[in-house]
């Protein structure tokens, strides 16, 4: 009989990145546990308090329309999204980190950013154009700037609530008031588990 604490993947934290990682692991067939040290009513980490804007590389309007198929021809004619390619994204991250980002990892982040947006949409995360904060009117069109075109419906709260709903629907267990305190390793140094401090004390 399988122990109730036997999981293939343990995700520590319950922000946007964590919950997407949990969904991805579950999609691959893994039994997944998410640990959230906050109580349920304060769940979601920093993601809950963000505006829900997402930065990703894209080549132009066609890719934005592919991501947001609800944008009809009339709306398309009234907007200018420009482009924000891989080199733009890469350069911006290197600029704000003063060149300290790992180049190889950053290249993966940049090149996978648009496919990840498509994947999140297909999982059930709804996106909309960020008219309110990232567009200004110029020569009869609403022009987007700064490489930020899209936001999640409902901002950070909407994103967080939706991701928790998707995790629940996928059969992913979330434990609240539960913090990872230590990694367990086998005699070869391979990670084999995690020590959890929960409401009833420590467990593994």
Task: Give residue ranges: language-model regions.
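Beta1/beta-strand and adjacent pyrophosphate-binding region of the FAD-binding site
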Residues: 3-17, 33
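Core beta-strand elements of the Rossmann-like FAD/NAD(P) dinucleotide-binding domain
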Residues: 3-7, 199-204
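Gly/Ala-rich phosphate-binding loop of Rossmann-like dinucleotide-binding domains
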Residues: 22, 26
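Glycine-rich FAD pyrophosphate-binding loop
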Residues: 27-50
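Short, solvent-exposed loop/turn and secondary-structure capping segments
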Residues: 43-47, 60, 132
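N-terminal glycine-rich dinucleotide-binding loop that anchors FAD/FMN and/or NAD(P) in oxidoreductases
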Residues: 48-87
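Second-shell loop/turn segments in exported
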Residues: 75-80, 92-108, 149
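Conserved redox-cofactor binding core of oxidoreductases
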Residues: 104-203
